[in-house]
Amino acid sequence: MSRVIVKGLPIYLKEDRLRDLIEKRLTQKHQSTDVQSYLSDVKLMKNRDGESRRFAFIGFRDEEDAFDCVNYFNGTFVDTSKIEVSMAKSFADPRVPQPMREKRREALKRLREREELLLADKKDSQKKQKSDSNNDGGKKHDIDAEIAKNKQLQEFINTMKPSSQVTSWETVQSSKTQGEDEEAADDEVGEMSSNPLLSQALALKGNSRDADEDTDMFKLPGNESDDEYVSLNGGSNNANTDEPEPQMMSLDTFDTAGPTSTDDMAKDEAVSDLDWLKNRRVRIKDGADTPVSKQQQQPDTEQQQPEETEVETSQESEEEKSLKKIRETGRLFLRNILYTATEDDFRKLFSPYGELEEVHIAVDTRTGQSKGFAYVLFKNADNAATAFVELDKQIFQGRLLHILPADAKKSHKLDEFDLKNLPLKKQRELKRKANSAQQTFSWNSLYMNQDAVLSSVADKLGMKKSELIDAENSSSAVKQALAEASVIGDVRKFFETRGVDLTKFAQLKNSERDDRVILVKNFPYGTTREEIAELFLPFGKLQRLLLPPSGTIAILQFRDVPAARAAFSKISYKRFKDGIIYLEKGPSDCFTRDAQGDELVESETDIQKATAKEAKISGADLLEAQSLPAADKDDHDDDDDDDDVQAGPTVSIFIKNLNFSTTSQQLTEKFKPFNGFVVAQVKTKPDPKQPGKTLSMGFGFAEFKTKEQANAVISAMEGTILDGHKLQLKLSHRQGTSTTNASSKKKKKNQGKIIVKNLPFEATRKDVFELFSSFGQLKSVRVPKKFDKSARGFAFVEFLLPKEAENAMDQLQGVHLLGRRLVMEFVEQDPEDVEQQIEKMTRKVKKQVNTTKIANMRNSGKRKIDLDEDDENDGLQG
């Protein structure tokens, strides 16, 4: 946790003053004027009116600074207000109180869920009612038949009518004089008007008829006559009348007429219930309208079901949606990150959750600054989901890290279907270009084109390549190897004087590569600095470009990582002039200083000016320039100091009794004013309690160009005080970092004998002798052979003096003989003690005996063998 909360601030306090208070404490702790990199965020909380809420959040890059802020400021006073400082909590912390906005949101969510449950219950009840009404439709005929048969039931129904629906006595008396049939009809109509269930049964009674019948009249039960039907339609009671019978109002007429007339009739007291009922009747065709309406209702209910599922899916939480997308893409989008955060910071943060495929920080191409967001791509999408759950809304470098699901990365790779239609040669080229970013080269980092090497040496000697290499001479391969060794030596010296640490190339690993540093190889001799810059400048700004005078290899450094990646993927294996360019990512921290002078690349015009000054240089000028490289690097006013500077190994001063809080930057500032200063460094070791951090070991080194300058510094700085400690200085017996080789440990045991591995099978003893005799007097050269007299691929070379062997090792590192890179090591020295010699011989004899036993067991068919080694003294006992 690197974020703190400050409570109890004065209401008038501004962010600027709060920032000044924190920076003042950081300056005291780190003893540096530039403390902005340690402070990541200062946020004073305000209300809607812009007034301070009297608390603030402060973010630090390191947790150590956050704890120091809590211990230092907690309980102190700002003006007259006592402040309370404590570690801030993230949103994922369960102890954080829920804000009112979230409470309202959850209350609305619960209310919405209850409403949906009520709507669902209501729909279920409606469906149940519809199903019950459909079941009641089959009982209509039974009800009508029962009422028609039972006269007592009819009388009971009429008697139980409410008073508002009973007609006057005069109407009843007149209805009795019309006959029994007419009375039955009146009773039927009165019964229908008084009982709503019976009225519905009579209105829907026609639905049970056959579909082929089409009539506009209701069909009454069989015990009723046509006269009663005529009176029901409102005609005369006389059946012999010639007047046309009034027909039932059609649906169209009813729709156009509207309900106004029927409403007036309902208000008119003179209108009887029978007349009102006749005007309210609507004809329903048998088997036509009702099924259609049912069919229309059923799809409606079916269409409502998907809507319900849509509501349910829309209520899916945002976190579940995010996890679903992350499991598909495996890519995370990070925002609210620190602008000075690097890709390595996020690799350390996310690598514990799974293997990462890519980490990309968006960079502004104009300014080179981060845009404040990044992308992280996992090889396994499940690991990305786990990282999202664990790290979202957590505090990282003093800021609340906000993680969102990112879209899938756009890829322009050709699949196998597209590749199979191309020629085989084109397929291999495309695959090699696509895998160039993950490819590691088998040759040495300072690999050079052999033709460019010969052209450079021939131009340096002022002769033609045909004169340098004679095709009829058997020693042409040796001459080519010696020429390459000479060029490699010149390139090493050039890079060392330009601040390149060549020991990083010898210890190069995939995990230690820097995406911004690119080694450009295999371009033809004569390629200028301007041409290389024009090739890479379209992808982004170059921070450094180094091209040795030999013109066989170049090292460039981009300002931005995305630009370097784009250039690497686009230019790798690209045809350039009459060759193909090879690119390799350089090691991290391979530069010991910042770019200076002509190493800087600002624009194409600057490249043109620089190359115009490098027109043609003779071999003497090159040697003179290499012997005095410091004249261009230092800006001292004293000319005598510049003349004393020498190229090659630097002289180191061992500094002990350092304060454990002293940093390399403080040590550099202490020794930087002296002439000839190169670099100062405090030795550190990993902190076992805090992974990723280091602890000072209490001593360090300071390098100077000459021994005289180092002695002057020792006499001047011996006994001085730094961070309360008295410094103790003395000359170091090791060489500078610029010339330290990976095989330095082996050189201590050097006896002048070298084993040469990866030797071409075509190479003879004469070739090996001619190659190594150029560096000293040889004592013996041995090339082991097989039983058929062919070489075994290695050789032993023994020099007369160990110093000559070391010189040969340095000069021939990375040299190719007949197309193979020579790998050389010092042979393990023979033991001087007699007991050690006997022990060595014993191990050798035991190994031979075990080999013989295994062969005999295999030939005899036995499978059980004992491979356990006996005691070491068994071979000495009789």
Swiss-Prot record:
Residues 295-304 have a biased composition (Low complexity). GO terms for molecular function: mRNA binding. Residues 159-177 have a biased composition (Polar residues). Residues 2-90, 330-408, 516-588, 651-734, 752-829 form the RRM domain. Belongs to the RRM MRD1 family. Involved in pre-rRNA processing. This is Multiple RNA-binding domain-containing protein 1. The lineage of its organism: Eukaryota, Fungi, Dikarya, Ascomycota, Saccharomycotina.
